[in-house]
């Protein structure tokens, strides 16, 4: 049996779909469907069962899944970087992750979990080492803290954490303001022909802030590779290894539609000091572990994503 937490979310649902494509339907999907629109992410997927995240945790603690689970892909978390309820974040992200790790350690179950590039905060280097980790918000701190916990353990199972950089692609529409800029630029262009980007900040020209934009399909491939290589443990960056600008994303959206323009808007005061103007994954450790697949560029993946979006109809549209 395979468990995917956050299964109705962005990366989790893409992972479930990819497992289906590999012929695996023996999947327990774990999530919180308070936002019922997330069910659309699983509507075309095959699963064995669905469990609410709290119910699943209770059954894990009670030992009801002992010896029954092959791997847990732990993608579930509150991923809002603007959420400042620290008590909620610690319970939902940190303590929950610890409980699942303790289960996997006890039952020798593989544990592959979502960390985040946000742990690097304002760092200018993105290498998996302690002196470069400077979280700027409580979400990032919750992820950082669990990575620290993992480092101090000596579990009897595979434990692999992936520090996701700026992931974009199908099945992210439920994320609202936290969805990718590719998603928002596409919506803006369809609405009024204009992609709105922030003006320059931190010494960057307008729209030239740089991020490591990584396509969700590639993120899923790394997760599956780790599952298939159970001897690999550790915390790894998961990005393309090549930063691209917000202008690059906007231009890819405009090129796909064959129309549109860019407008630069003032940088919000509330984000100053809590914003990463540059991220670029250092993939040295992931490559050294044996991962050889290439990652799609913005120019390659954005058209693929927008073609998928054009086939979808979402609630509220």
UniProtKB/Swiss-Prot annotation:
Complex and partners: Homopentamer.
Positions annotated to bind substrate: 166, 177, 184, 198-201, 211, 275
InterPro entries, per database record: Epimerase_deHydtase (IPR001509), Heptose_epim (IPR011912), NAD(P)-bd_dom_sf (IPR036291)
Keyword Ligase applies: no
Pathway: Nucleotide-sugar biosynthesis; ADP-L-glycero-beta-D-manno-heptose biosynthesis; ADP-L-glycero-beta-D-manno-heptose from D-glycero-beta-D-manno-heptose 7-phosphate: step 4/4
Taxonomy, superkingdom: Bacteria
Catalytic residues as annotated in Swiss-Prot or TrEMBL: 139 (proton acceptor), 175 (proton acceptor)
PANTHER family in UniProt: ADP-L-GLYCERO-D-MANNO-HEPTOSE-6-EPIMERASE, NUCLEOSIDE-DIPHOSPHATE-SUGAR EPIMERASE
Record's protein name: ADP-L-glycero-D-manno-heptose-6-epimerase
CDD domains the record matches: ADP_GME_SDR_e (cd05248)
Cofactor note: Binds 1 NADP(+) per subunit.
Species name: Shewanella piezotolerans (strain WP3 / JCM 13877)
GO biological process entries: ADP-L-glycero-beta-D-manno-heptose biosynthetic process; carbohydrate metabolic process
Gene Ontology molecular-function annotations: ADP-glyceromanno-heptose 6-epimerase activity; NADP binding
Stored NCBIfam families: heptose_epim, PRK11150.1
Binding site for NADP(+): 10-11, 31-32, 38, 53, 75-79, 92, 143, 167, 175
